């Protein structure tokens, strides 16, 4: 997900996306531990998406203060 797309979301939608990505990351880590994960690049993509969302949320929080 690109930063431009994330910025278009509301704060609640961003928090929901972050929650979804965290759940996906948990599942991917579990698959990796059991040797079932085929696309290991997905781990880094999901982590980066979480970081993007957190960064934009903190930017919005600073704007509002």
Swiss-Prot record:
This protein's encoding gene: rpmC
Superkingdom to which the source organism belongs: Bacteria
SUPFAM superfamilies: Ribosomal protein L29 (L29p)
UniProt protein name: Large ribosomal subunit protein uL29
GO BP of this protein: translation
UniProt record similarity statement: Belongs to the universal ribosomal protein uL29 family.
Classification lineage: Bacteria, Bacillati, Bacillota, Bacilli, Lactobacillales
CDD domains listed in its UniProt record: Ribosomal_L29_HIP
GO MF entry, a single one: structural constituent of ribosome
């Amino acid at each position: 997900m690109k930063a431009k797309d994330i910025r278009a979301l509301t704060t609640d939608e961003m928090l929901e996306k972050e929650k979804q990505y965290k759940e996906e990351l948990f599942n991917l880590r579990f698959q990796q531990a059991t040797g079932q994960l085929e696309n290991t690049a997905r781990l880094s993509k999901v982590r980066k998406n979480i970081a993007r969302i957190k960064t934009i949320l903190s930017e919005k929080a600073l704007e509002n203060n």
